[in-house]
């Protein structure tokens, strides 16, 4: 699999990448100076425990079945949010005789050749997978619960439908609008659960409805500020978000930025979550920071840490890509030019 990234090179913050937009191989081939010497590979973190109420951390790791103990002043959890598939309960799934796959395990489309495929979920992964499968499948049902059909210029082989109500037979799927379709494959593009099995109970981290709590600014554990979570925000430019979060955390560790008291951070975390829920948004979307929320978040961190603001051309690139993604399946083929004055021009 070598999916092309949906982000432009200029907002990936990786200057050596030349492909626009880069694929999986180009991204994997990036090497940051010094990382191979300092990183320990093929090692699994077994447990992380706070010592002296978070003043230091006991970390147990497993390498070649040998568990060793290390102690650190701080811990950054950078495990991402795409490792534990969320598999929704589907009534009658035990009667289904076709194949079921989660997007986490998707690699190539060749096994779907000539098949009728139901893709459940129309987020970025669901759409990308449906488009790739559509090049070889007989029919693709893109099923979702969004209030309106997506306005993309999908190829004729892709048919938008409601979500799944139940499975009625070997390959018979009943949709929520009562329509019946036959599918030999079901591909679940239903997201992921946030799990941190390596964090001990003493870390006092909860993940109810995929909200990591209690975190200050989506980064700092309010009780243990030397424990940070990097990369939780969704619907963002991930590399820029993670860069600013890293700088914020390191500034706090170095002492150039002073954090509020633990109690104040905990109160702020609870207040932010309550505000999110009271506004009518789903609790599970607390870490979503679309567009203006993202820019405000980055500006807040920049002001606190004295960092440069996000350049305007990056915001323009994000807006252009988002707009084209909404209506065009080939948005990744867009050609971008940034003029000397910072103006962004694009064409296909």
Where do the protein language model's features map onto the residues?
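Short glycine-rich His-centered loop
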Residues: 14-23
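Flavin (primarily FAD) cofactor-binding/catalytic cores of flavoenzymes
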Residues: 23-265, 278-348
